[in-house]
């Protein structure tokens, strides 16, 4: 009996140890498969469905929405991530070349032997000259040779196996043709530009791009459309320098992956539609007319103020009025010498210009009831005579 009890206790202990080891393995497998949670979850559901007993009723399947938090990004996080990747990536000297095969090494060896055998003449075909502003990339049997680009100076290559490509490192100009752009205030215009760039990494350039000018042209057009969509027409016309700088920074962030350095971009011309030009011209003309009217009104106001001040001064000094009257007569005789001017006596002018006469509207003549005395009465003889 004791032996049977001991054996049963040993079996129970073994079963518990095996179950605990299985649980540990499942926990480890669960930790390792966290990255593959979604596909494994579907597989676990299928396995649990298969292992369920036939007699037990199945519970209704619960639907749930699984959201991967890592894939949810904000509107600005993607651009920030791209900029961070570009800043962290260092410019390489060239693409890592792949090694040559056995047959290729045999061909290289045979070519070297042939060059050595025909040394005096073959050397002229194996050496080339590279200018100071050029770099040469050599491909041997289609593989990029390790190391930096060759040049300036002499470089050696195998005529039968090697092909070389020269890359100009000088500043190059690319004219961007007119293309339509929609502004922030929904105006449609045509803009052309010019882009200045240079080749920085010849190996990376030849391995990345087939048509450099087309790639840069399309990139400039799409970048300008994207940036100018956030600016109004007035900003585009007045802030060309800042817009060109923004376009240059955006282009340089992309072309550095191709081994190209964008030095400068400029907006050459802005072409507006005919209807928009007419409306802008009408608006500008109306503004000019309004300014002219304001200036004329201000001039008339200043002239009236001057005349009022002059009238006040002349009314206070009668001698000044007389001098002004004489000056006017002199100017009339000077301008029109054939005209005869008969001046009125100054006393009559002062009488006409007096405030009382202006109020009455006429000169006070003597009344008709009294006899009018003659101006030159005849002297009567004295009674003594």
UniProtKB/Swiss-Prot annotation:
Its main location: membrane. Pfam families: Band_7. It comes from Mus musculus (Mouse). It is found in: Membrane. Plays a role in the regulation of glomerular permeability, acting probably as a linker between the plasma membrane and the cytoskeleton. Gene3D superfamilies: 6.10.250.2090, Band 7 domain. Residues 357-370 have a biased composition (Polar residues). Residues 1-104 are cytoplasmic. It is a single-pass membrane protein. Residues 1-64, 357-385 are annotated as: Disordered. Residues 126-385 are extracellular. This is Podocin. The keyword Lipoprotein applies. Residues 1-27, 376-385 have a biased composition (Basic and acidic residues). InterPro entries: Band-7_stomatin-like, Band_7, Band_7/SPFH_dom_sf, Stomatin_HflK_fam. One of its GO terms (cellular component) is slit diaphragm. Belongs to the band 7/mec-2 family. The keyword Lipoprotein applies. Interacts with nephrin/NPHS1, KIRRL1 and CD2AP. Interacts with DDN. Signal peptide: none annotated. Keywords: Lipoprotein, Membrane, Palmitate, Transmembrane, Transmembrane helix. The chain crosses the membrane at residues 105-125. One of its GO terms (biological process) is actin cytoskeleton organization. A lipid is attached at residue 103 (S-palmitoyl cysteine). The gene is Nphs2.
